[in-house]
Each structure stands twice: as C-alpha cells, then as structure tokens.
Regions:
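Short, non-transmembrane alpha-helical segments in secretory-pathway proteins
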Residues: 31-63, 116-125, 186-191
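Structural alpha-beta junctions
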Residues: 188-205
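N-terminal Lys/Arg-rich, disordered targeting/topogenic segments
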Residues: 1-13
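Exposed beta-strand-loop-beta-strand "reactive/processing" segments of non-cytosolic proteins
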Residues: 57-94
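Hydrophobic membrane-insertion alpha-helices, especially the h-region
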Residues: 14-33
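A short, surface-exposed beta-strand/turn
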Residues: 88-111
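Extracytoplasmic/luminal low-complexity segments enriched in Pro/Gly and acidic/polar residues
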Residues: 200-258
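Non-cytosolic head/periplasmic domains of membrane-anchored proteins
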Residues: 103-187
Length: 258
C-alpha cells in the first residue's frame, strides 16, 4: 500500500471518528441548554417566592439558563410578578447553591415612580418619559422582608443599609442640539426635583435628550453632586455623550465624583 493511500485512509478514519463526537457534543449541549424542560425548577421558584413573602401567590415565567459553559453549570433566570399585579415584574435566580429575587426592588421602584410622578410632570411636562430603578445588594436579600414576609419600607431599610442600595432615576425628553440656556434650565429643574429624592441611598439621576442605536446624549450625575451645583458652566458641562449600555459605567465616579 502506498504512503499516499495510507495517509488518505488515516485522514478518513479521523473524520469518521471526529464527526460523530462533534454531533454527540452538540446534541448533549442542546438537550442541556435548549430543549431541557425546566418545569420542576419553575414550580420550585414559585414555591420559594410564596414561602418567602408570607403566602403571596406569584406567576413565574419559563426559566432560561444563563452563564452556562461546558464546565460551568450557570443558573436559571425567570421573570415573575405577583398574581394580583402583572405590572411589577422582577427576576428570580435559581442555582444549585442559592435562590434570590428582585421583588423588593421592583416594589420600591413602583412606589417611588408613583410618588415622583406629580413632581416630574410639574417640572418637565405631563407625559414625560421616566423610570425609577431600585436594586439591592445580594447580602440584603433576607433583610428586605420581616418575619411576616412583608417587604420593609424603603425609608426604613435605607436607614440601615444606606448606600448599599442603588437608586436610579432616568428622565427622557428628546430634543436635539440643546442650547446652553436649555441645558442650564434642565439642571435647575433636576436640582429642584432632587429635594424629593432619597439621600440615604446611592442615588443617581440621568437625563437623556438624544438617543440612537449606539449612543445617547444627556447627563448622569450622583445626587450629592447635583445638589452642590451652582455655577452655570458646571451645569452646562454635565452634558455629554455615552455608549448605549454603558451608562452604569459612565463617569459617575470620576471627574470630581469620587
């Protein structure tokens, strides 16, 4: 048998061995991460929420696996909401070692959004687009509820954990090419609004005046720094551009905001 023919047979043999292995790996991964039925975990999430929040019923969506790789199990994530209020949606996380959820933050966000609405509409106009997002560090998960499964009021838990609770207010009023006078007026209104914002939490304010698929324009500033502003040029200089999705990493902790 010639060397060339032998080499060809060896290559063909390798192909016959490798291809089935690759197919097997793809099937296993697909069954694990795509086709697997997570009904059992979905039910467990609903039971976990009901037990944690004093018998309250929740609707839990279909879990999906995130953060999984060949050697990493990852975790399951589902969107849930109270059975009597589908507007308060939050994430539930389920892993082999722990379960936690964002229900408290969703409730606080909803309450704060309703509380701030009259003041925001007064300053920026009725129908102004805004969101309030409040989260809490994972170590606060058990501290968010009392012994009866009731969520502790934001003011009360902020007295204990303070800056460990991120509080974000974002206002969007689209208008291109703002003049310096308009920028100053916006900041002045935000300063007036800041009197209604909690100062014990890690509070930050965002204002968006221009947006595109990749970039946004406006300002993002911690509450304490917003309240200190008095110079006209400092107010104007707050406005800049940032990449969409990078707002949390926007320069809130630099340029004097350390």
């Amino acid at each position: 048998m010639g060397i060339a023919k032998l080499g060809k047979q060896i290559k063909e043999h390798k192909v016959f061995v490798i291809v089935p292995i690759v197919i097997l790996i793809v099937v296993v991964l697909a069954r694990t991460f795509i086709w697997r039925d997570y009904t059992k975990e979905q039910i467990e999430m609903a039971i976990y929420l009901k037990d944690k929040y004093g018998g309250q019923e929740f609707v839990v969506g279909k879990p999906v696996r995130e953060g999984a790789m060949l050697a990493i199990e990852g975790y399951l994530v589902a969107i849930a909401y109270p059975a009597n209020n589908s507007k308060i949606k939050f994430r539930v996380i389920h892993s082999s070692s722990a379960r936690y959820d964002g229900y408290a933050g969703a409730v606080w966000s909803d309450e704060e959004s309703k509380r701030l609405e009259p003041e925001i509409y007064r300053l920026f106009g009725k129908g102004t687009d805004y969101t309030v997002e409040i989260k809490s560090a994972l170590e606060l998960q058990n501290a968010q509820v009392n012994f009866h499964g009731k969520i502790i009021a934001l003011d009360d838990i902020a007295k204990i954990y303070g800056k460990q609770i991120p509080y974000g207010l974002a206002i969007k009023r689209l208008k291109k090419n703002l003049s310096d006078d308009e920028k100053e007026d916006i900041v002045n209104k935000l300063i007036e609004l800041s009197a209604s914002l909690p100062d014990k939490t890690d509070t930050a304010v965002t204002y968006i005046s221009e947006t595109s698929e990749k970039r946004e324009y406006g300002l993002a500033v911690p509450l304490d720094n917003l309240r200190k502003l008095s110079n006209r040029q400092d107010k104007i200089n707050l406005f800049s551009e940032w990449k969409v999705g990078g707002l949390q990493d926007y320069d809130l902790r630099q340029d004097g905001f350390n």
